[in-house]
């Protein structure tokens, strides 16, 4: 990523997250249990992938649909607030990193590692 794409991605992430916090996105499926993790912007600034996580037992398909429906509104608001001549087209993807992390923790906690035997050590 170039400095510009990284800067635009961070600005979009902050703006979308603050819009969620302030309740500017009216869809109730996006309230409370959705977190913006990262935004990756294409080199030509025409597309931005917004990675989000959903906490709890929220309807993930419903959340994806809500993002899709709100994308035009968000693009318009982002263009105005960030003073971009052409705001990138927003694409939303569920970020599975939290799920992977949880699964790895479960696997590590399930390992039965025998205690270290101090009698084998040589001094």
Swiss-Prot record:
PROSITE patterns: RBFA. Keywords: Cytoplasm, Ribosome biogenesis. GO terms for biological process: maturation of SSU-rRNA. NCBIfam families: rbfA. One of several proteins that assist in the late maturation steps of the functional core of the 30S ribosomal subunit. Associates with free 30S ribosomal subunits (but not with 30S subunits that are part of 70S ribosomes or polysomes). Required for efficient processing of 16S rRNA. May interact with the 5'-terminal helix region of 16S rRNA. The keyword DNA-binding does not apply. It comes from Magnetococcus marinus (strain ATCC BAA-1437 / JCM 17883 / MC-1). SUPFAM superfamilies: Ribosome-binding factor A, RbfA. Transmembrane segments: none annotated. Monomer. Binds 30S ribosomal subunits, but not 50S ribosomal subunits or 70S ribosomes. This is Ribosome-binding factor A.
């Amino acid at each position: 990523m170039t400095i510009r794409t990284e800067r635009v991605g961070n600005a979009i992430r902050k703006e979308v997250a603050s819009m969620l916090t302030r309740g500017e996105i009216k869809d109730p499926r996006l309230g409370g249990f959705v977190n913006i993790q990262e935004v990756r912007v294409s080199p030509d600034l025409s597309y931005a992938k917004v990675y989000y996580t959903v906490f709890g037992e929220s309807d993930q398909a419903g959340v994806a649909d809500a993002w899709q429906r709100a994308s035009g509104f968000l693009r318009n608001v982002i263009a105005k607030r960030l003073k971009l001549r052409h705001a990138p087209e927003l694409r939303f993807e569920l970020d599975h990193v939290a799920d992977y992390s949880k699964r790895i923790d479960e696997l590590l906690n399930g390992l039965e590692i025998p205690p270290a035997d101090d009698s084998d050590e040589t001094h």
